[in-house]
Amino acid sequence: MAMKSRYIWLASIGVAISNLIIGMGVGSYYFTDVVGDIAKLSMVTMFTSLNVLAMVIFPVLLKRYSVMQVAAGVAVVGSVGYLINFFAGANMGLLIIGALLGSFAGLPFNYLRSVICMQIADYNEANNMVRMEATLAAVMNFLGKIGSALGSFMVGGLLSMSGYNGALEVQPDSAIFMIRVLYGLVPAIFTILTVLCAVGFRPLDKWTRENEK
């Protein structure tokens, strides 16, 4: 029954993409080979921890917008952040801004997952189907783990194809460019895909609004 719901697939793909980006773990490569100082990664990580403020903002936004509308808006902001990362080079100011904006992208799919499950379950129940909250959560968690694994696999494969060699002190230009692409462009593209997943929820959002009146 869960597999027949397009909404569980859309939500699960959003979770998988968010975890894929996290699983890529390109930051260490970027700050070692592009910035030239791995120690500066900790500074950027410190600023991205500010995204916990979203936990305060989300409840306010959810009073006016649906979870998926919030997810779409945050994903657009995140994609801008990732694009900044691609063009930032070794500019720490831009890297901090880009990383902070990018860190917001996957928060709705990961931290508001239970709300999404409840919305889908309510829809199932109204259409004479089993609510299946536990099944919905399990599908999301499973695809999320697949996303994390794919992120790591993809980075390893693309870096190898670009000529990256961990034994070299200076990487070839092709490897440096690939690291920049993986740190900026690839996450931006995947984040835009989560926007499309959120847009696919419009009929369900409309149904939810009509049934809350």
Question: Which residues fall in each region the model found?
Answer:
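Membrane-embedded alpha-helical bundles of multi-pass transporters/translocases
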Residues: 1-213
